[in-house]
C-alpha cells in the first residue's frame, strides 16, 4: 500500500490528458498542514516553467482531468498552481482494513507488482579487525548495516551479508610471535588470549622495543603467507577466539550476522596476484618506483595530477585496495549481486570511490551492478571529541552495552519498585540495548553525534524506551479489553483517527526510502511520529470507557492493533526488541 504511488499514477495520467509531456513528474508530497489537504501535487509548477505558460491555468486543466473518485473527498487549487488533495475517510478506512489483514502490514513484497522484482543485494558491514576486541567505533557500521539488511529482507529482496573481517596483515606476525612465546612457557592459548586488547598491546610493546622481536614477527608474516602449518595453526587460534567474541557482541546487540556471513580479507588471497596481472595486462596499472599502481585520471586535479592507487607494493605485498577489487569481482560474479552496499566510516569514502573507478574500468564490476559506499559520521563524547574513556582510551563495545543495561535497570526499578528480578533482567536488557541502538540509528547517517546517556534512556521524546513504552501500553489495553478482534472493521470518524491512518499507510514509502538511501533514521522518525500520533489518539478517542458503543470500541481496538504491529515491525527492522509490559 503506497498512497504516494497511487496518487502519482492518477495525477500523471491527468497531466498527460491536460497536454503535458509523458514522464512529467507530478511531485506528490505529504502536506505539512491538514488545512491544505493530506497530499499535494506540485509538479505543475515546474512543468509550467518549462512550457513558459501560466501555472494556475495549467493546474486548472490538470484538476479537470484528475480522476480521484472514491479516493479524495476534495481537490482544490492553491497559490500559483499547487493541487491540494483531501483523502476520503472511507477510502482510508478501506485501505487500513486491508493492511490490518496483511502479514506485511501493507508493505508490498518484491515480485508481486510488475517492475518491482526482487534483487540480490550484497551488504558489507561490521567488519571488525580480528585479534582485537570490538570497540565503540564498530557500533555504527554494525547496526546501521543490519537495519538496512532487515529492511531489504522485509521488502522481499535476497540479501547476502558479508562480514569483511580484518583477519590478515602484517600485525599478525607480531601476534603469532608473542603467542608462540606464551605457549612455550606452558600458557594455554585461551588463557593468553582472554583479553585480546591487552595481548595486542603487549605484542606491540615488544615489537617496538624488544631487540630481535620485530625481525621474528616479520619472518612469521612471511611464513604465514607462505602457508607454514605452525604459523597457520596459531593464526587460526586468534581468528577463532576473536570471532567468538564478535558473536557474543552480535547476540547482545540483536544483530543478524552469523559465522557463515564472514568473508574475511584472507578469503581473497588467492585472487590478488590475478587481479594485479589483469590490471597490468589491460594497461590499467603500471610500474612506478617498483610498485604496481593505477593513476586515476578521472580524479586528476586542475594541474592534471592524478591520484595514485597502489595495488602491489614494491616488495610484492598486496594492499586493502587489491582485496577490495577482488571483492568486487567475487560479489558481482560469484554472488551475482545486482547491488553492493558497503558501510564504513567517512574516512574511507575516497578509497571506495577509487575502488569503484578502477573496478569498473577493469571489468571487475559490471556497469549494471550498483555499487554504493555508505559512509557514516563518528560517535562523539560530550566534549565534542571522539568518544573515549576518561583516561583517553578506547571504549570496548561489550562494556558500553553492559553499562546500558545497568543504567536501564536502575531507571526501571525506580519507576517500578515491585518488578520481579526475572522481569527486570529481561526488560532492562531490551531497554538498555534498544536505547543505545535507537540513539545511533535516529541520527543522520553521515553526521557525527554526541553520545548522551540521559537523553537516550529517557521515556520521553524520540527514544527507544518511549517507543517500547507505547507498544507495551497498547498491549495493556488489549489485556484490559480481554480480546483483540483482528477482523473488526476500522471506521475513521475523528481527526485523530484519520491522522493515525494516514501515518500507518506511509510505512511502505518509508521502508523504500530507508532501502534506497540506506538511512534508518527515516524509519526512526516515522516510528516516533506514529507513537506520538497514537498518544494523541489515545487521549482524544476513548476505547474502553463506559458508554462507548461496541462498534466504535472494536474499530478502535483494531486500529490499536495495526499501530502495535507497525511499531513492532518497525522496531524489529531496527533490531530493537519490544515487550508486552514495562
Swiss-Prot record:
One Gene Ontology CC term in the entry: cytoplasm
Highest rank taxon of the organism: Bacteria
Enzyme Commission number(s) from the entry: 6.1.1.19
Extent of motif 'HIGH' region: 128-138
Primary residence: cytoplasm
InterPro entries: aa-tRNA-synth_I_CS (IPR001412), Arg-tRNA-ligase (IPR001278), Arg-tRNA-synth_N (IPR005148), Arg-tRNA-synth_N_sf (IPR036695), ArgRS_core (IPR035684), DALR_anticod-bd (IPR008909), Rossmann-like_a/b/a_fold (IPR014729), tRNAsynth_Ia_anticodon-bd (IPR009080)
Keyword check for Transcription: no
Catalytic activity: tRNA(Arg) + L-arginine + ATP = L-arginyl-tRNA(Arg) + AMP + diphosphate
Lineage, opening ranks: Bacteria, Pseudomonadati, Pseudomonadota, Gammaproteobacteria, Alteromonadales
Keywords linked to the UniProt accession: Aminoacyl-tRNA synthetase, ATP-binding, Cytoplasm, Ligase, Nucleotide-binding, Protein biosynthesis
GO terms assigned for molecular function: arginine-tRNA ligase activity; ATP binding
Transmembrane segments: none
Family: Belongs to the class-I aminoacyl-tRNA synthetase family.
GO biological process: arginyl-tRNA aminoacylation
Source organism (scientific name): Colwellia psychrerythraea (strain 34H / ATCC BAA-681)
Subcellular location: Cytoplasm
Description of how the protein assembles with itself and partners: Monomer.
Entry protein name: Arginine--tRNA ligase
Top-level class of the enzyme under EC nomenclature: ligase
Keyword check for Aminoacyl-tRNA synthetase: yes
Gene name tied to this protein: argS
Pfam families xrefs: Arg_tRNA_synt_N (PF03485), DALR_1 (PF05746), tRNA-synt_1d (PF00750)
